[in-house]
Amino acid sequence: MSAETFKADYQGATVCPSPNFEERKDGAKPQFLVLHYTGMENAESAERLLCSPEAKVSAHYVVEEDGKVVQLVQEAYRAWHAGESFWRGVTDVNSHSIGIEIVNGGPLLNFPDYPEKQIESVIKLCKSIIKKYSIEKRNVLGHSDIAPHRKSDPGEKFPWENLFKAGIGHFVRPALISGGRFMTNGESGRPVEAYQSMLALYGYGIDITGSFDERTQLVTKAFQRHFRPQKVDGVADVSTIDTLHRLLGTLKSLT
């Protein structure tokens, strides 16, 4: 489709049209909100890439470091931000989501902190989208949640707890890291099967095999980045399992 200008869906956003979008498949509506970091040097380079026809990537919004919000794709259309992904049985996450790219260098710039003003804008934008589409708290996600085998954004420095305190997403206070039993790559048995079942029940794409394989390790890292960021090592320790168990226990109370 052509990159024609349009009226911003979000009040206060600046429009910078990207040609990288299409119709949502089968009339799908947004039910997920996916947050990314750009992983590039600055906003200008990220927006240039997201608007390049050759790149074939995009997002609905970019939030710059100073809090400026730029809309690239209208919310009605399918932006190309999720790629090969999965959440709660959905494999075409692009058709079912709104994507927000948050300007942050990630590993390129040694994982800088997210500025407070930027996070304030992210919160306001998320609230608007969540209200408009009645997005469930459990469906406010990081890219690594839906693609743990290939993505790590928005990273362990992203302040998910701050968003939760503002009414966005699902979160519980992470359990303290201590000693005790743990499961790691190469182990197998019923405890591993039970752990995989809990991850799958929450929404992650994982096969319940009873074997702690590379996929299980990657999903564990994704879970830790979002919900137990103090230590991201892919080991299912007591803290990780307890945090996951308490998240599942609060699902019924979510609105």
Specify the residue positions occupied by each region the protein language model found:
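Active-site-adjacent loop/helix surface patches within enzyme catalytic domains
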Residues: 2-138
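Cell-envelope/ECM-targeting effectors and their regulatory/trafficking segments
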Residues: 16, 83-86, 115-141, 145-255
